[in-house]
Amino acid sequence: MSADQEAKEDELLALASIYDEEEFHRAESGKEGEIHLCLELPPNFKLLVKGQKSAEHNISFLPPLVLSFDLPDDYPSTSAPIFTISSKWLTRVQITALCRKLDELWEENQGNVVLFTWIQFLKEETLDFLGIQSPLEIQRSGSQPQCEPAQKHAADASGEKSKVQDLDPRAVQEVDAQTDILTQLLDFDEAQKQRVFDGKAFCCGICYSEKLGCDCLLFKECEHVYCKACIKEYFQIQIKDGKVQCLNCPEPKCASTATPTQVKLLVGEDEFARYDRLLLQSSLDLMADVVYCPRMSCCMAVMVEPDSTMGICPSCRYAFCTLCRRSYHGLSHCIATADELRSLRDEYLSSSEEGKKFLEKRFGKRVIQRAVEESFSTDWLKTNCKQCPCCGTNIQKAHGCNKMTCSSCQKYFCWICLGALSRVNPYSHFNNPDSPCYNQLFHGMEMEEDEAFGSDEDD
């Protein structure tokens, strides 16, 4: 084995021992390979979209620089490695500058292996060498993610064009026309953060067991961590109870909520479908211009025009009043049932002046007055009267025994059980031992009458 071959083999073996398989890849030919270099960004590094100074994004990782190389037979004694540098977020001008810097490093170290020197420079000094600081400005439109101001110069006064900086053919810019560059950078940053998180150990805030991040869930807003087993059970209970707005961090007084993606990863398909449906419904409930079709077989969400009380269901085409949920009645006041009148009375009496005016406008002032009067009358009748079992007339018992005579149909009935009594012998109902009202003819009579009855007997 020649000295060059031995030096190359030793260098490649050293690189394979330093970097893992995801970072360093050696081709089967033995003299080619590539290495992926993720640069270490300073804390609080930001991305800034050109023309949108308010749209800054905090990131911790950028896609790697890729150094591809081919080692000639006479490397390192005579020839330099043949290489290319590719990047998704650097411009070709910037990559060209890196290529020329690697050429300079080869000139300084000619005759010696240089790959590790190149790698160290690219990994540790690229940002400083190119003058890249936070925020890093990127350009979303066009064929390239960033503008290249150094590539072009304005024409001088004589009309002659200034020299255009030559781009190195070894400088490769990876451009995916199908995906926005900002999306690519943010997705990569998120994936790398998740990878780092998965490899760390965390103490669950619920069961206090120590588990790897791959078995845990991180609430992104507050960064509290819980194991997936605990948080899954917590989510399932909340979804079962219909509390889809309460899938927040279990930490007391913490308002951070789980994302739908996190919920979907933990619960089953049926549970997530219920969660998704209830979440949509609760969101619609908060919208003032959304009501639901009153037909029980439909219940479709309906958009209501401003200053209108008519809703038309887009599914069943039912036209209804958005106030009383009955068929649309135009300018006529809403019609209320007896139970609704009672509720209307309570709402009206407890409302402010503005609330009372709204109810009067909705139902009509006469309807409101009738609701108040009739509901009070109904309450009094329910408290003090019973209905005749034969004709339904309300009967009040002021005094006397429990054998009652209806003032309307003249039928006899029992005040206790409301059973109809015999016209021939109505008192047999109270004298029969098998009757539920046996010996109850005078049950419930007022004490004054009892005492008076007793004193008459004594006389």
UniProtKB/Swiss-Prot annotation:
One of its GO terms (molecular function) is zinc ion binding. SMART domains: IBR (SM00647), RWD (SM00591). SUPFAM superfamilies: RING/U-box (SSF57850), UBC-like (SSF54495). It is an enzyme of class 2 (transferase). Signal peptide: none annotated. A zinc finger (IBR-type) spans 273-334. This is E3 ubiquitin-protein ligase RNF14. The gene is rnf14.
